[in-house]
Amino acid sequence: FHDKGGDDKSAESFSSLGILTAIADLAEHLDLVRNQEPGLRLYRARPGFKKSSPSAKDFGPPPRTVCQSNRMNPAGVPMFYGALDPRTAVKEVKEQSSQVGFFITVEPLRLLDLSRIPAVPGFFSEEPRRLRLYLSFLHYFADDIMQPVARDDRVHTEYVPSQVVTEFLREHTFEVGKLDGVVYG
């Protein structure tokens, strides 16, 4: 929880904030942070609708009062989870009976695209050790947020690490500005 001092170039001497900042800087350097022009179609499935024609509001994020904990957000902090195709949206909700809606973006978005993380260099690569560690972290984070979410009454503390990283990414100011979203898959 603190900087031990020592060599500023040693990853072991970084604070947690320093490590996350370095990973965010690497993501930007690798062009994982990208601008998305307006017109992107995002799909969202909602299970068990009783209405025959739901409204756009029905497909938005849930109200704070009923927002459950997910891989990237704690309970009470709503986030919009969208998919790039209807099939993925339906798979996300894991319900046989669901309706799918879509949104078309009208403004440019700044996105962190975790689907484009380069492979981790091999152990005998001449790439710096820190690059291997940070790329490994990005891959683990991407894998973690894609895991199924349990829908039960338990408190899922195992979601806290990915929620903390997500909150850091939401608040971090990249060279192009703050992020609007994360792409994974």
Where are the predicted features?
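Conserved structured core elements
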Residues: 83-87, 159
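A short, exposed loop/beta-hairpin motif centered on an aromatic-Gly-Thr core
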Residues: 76-82
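Active-site and NAD+-binding cores of ADP-ribose-processing enzymes
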Residues: 1-39, 44-73, 97-185
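Short active-site loop/helix that positions an aromatic residue
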Residues: 86-97
